[in-house]
Each structure stands twice: as C-alpha cells, then as structure tokens.
C-alpha cells in the first residue's frame, strides 16, 4: 500500500486509509475485493488517493490479467471529477525504463473528453516518448483486463477483445512491479465526494501468453481449491 510522497495526480495524498477489502456483488463467489477509494472535498489538504502494488519488480514477459470494476459515478457526492482508475506495470530507469498502462477516465482528463480507456506503452517518461490507443466508451462495471508480453510484442485486451499492440522499443526492457491506483487528475470544484475502483483478482503467468478463457479457468480452479493467494514467480524463472 503506497503512502509515499509524489504523484501522479494530487501530489503527496496517497493514503492507506483508502485501501480496503469489502465484499462486493459480482465478484468471484461474491467474496472480498480490493477497493481503492479516491476521495476529496475539493482541496489538496482534503484529498486522499489510493494505490497498491507488488513490492518486487520481477515481472516482465508473460500474461498479466486482472478483473476490475471501473466506476463512471462516485460512491457518494457530485460526479464529474477527472479520476484515473489504473492497472499498470512499471520498472527500470534510464535506458531500461519500462511502463505499460491501462488508464480509465470516465470523465476524461487533460482536456480530452471521456469516458475513455488509454492503453499506453512507454519508452521514456521524461521525453514523453510513448505509443497509445484510446478506446472511447464507458467501461462502467466489471471487465477482465489483460496485457501479454511475448517476443518483445505487447498486446492489450479487454474481455478477450484486442485493443492495441506495441513492439520494438515500446516493449519492456526490465523487470517491473504490478500496480493498481486511483487518483485525481485535478480538483475542478469544491464539495465532498468519493470514487471507488474494485479489483476482484490479479493473475500472472510468466511462461505463457494465455487467452482470457484460459485465465478465467485458471483463476476459478485455484479459487475452487481454496487458494486465494500464492506466488510462484521466482520459481518460474
């Protein structure tokens, strides 16, 4: 759980208080989920953002998948905020910098209208060298988001549908961490409101490029056997 300073969004507002694990309708077995809440009263001091990720940066090739509930409306308060609901990987620095993003913005941001999902492969964040594809539609509800990395080709999929691919210099050059965060691009008005982003499960396979059907089957098999968390990444390399 991130509590460190810095961005993105409203800097120095990352809070462990906004990370929780409630049960949720529509989750696998209607069980507990990760809930990341972005809340504000419209001021910097009254803002809390939420982020959770892996401590290690050992992820590179393979299949990344997460079942995520994106929200077009706040859980409480007035709507219209430029919130960013993100599933991403990041690692390395300098010539090894690597970042792969799924960024959902129900109300847009940075002057671009929403709802929209940006799938982004980075080469260099300092020079803003990246390639991306925008999917301009509402994603309110549950979706299985996937990123596969194989032979220096990155492919983004949603619910099994291919959204975007990148290759060459826009493929990862180092190990990365896997993260989820929920943050405000800006604070356009005053008043209390809170937005929720939910994550049902995260699955990673370092050795294979899998289909959404194969991922869902694996997750259901593991859950059915009572395995709610395990890490074999180090053993698979």
Where in the sequence are the language-model features?
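Low-complexity, Ser/Thr/Pro/Gly-rich disordered linker/stalk regions
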Residues: 1-79, 85, 91, 204-237
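Loop/turn elements at helix/coil->beta-strand transitions in domains of secreted/extracellular proteins
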Residues: 31, 97, 150-153, 175
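Structural recognition of the beta-strand scaffold that forms the well-ordered cores
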Residues: 35-37, 65-66, 86-88, 99-103, ...
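Short beta-strand segments enriched in hydrophobic/aromatic residues
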Residues: 38-40, 70, 104, 149, ...
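Glycan-recognition/cleft segments
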Residues: 85-121
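Short, aromatic/His-centered strand-loop micro-motif at the edge of beta-sheets
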Residues: 119-142
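Aromatic sugar-binding interfaces of carbohydrate-active proteins
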Residues: 137-138, 153-237
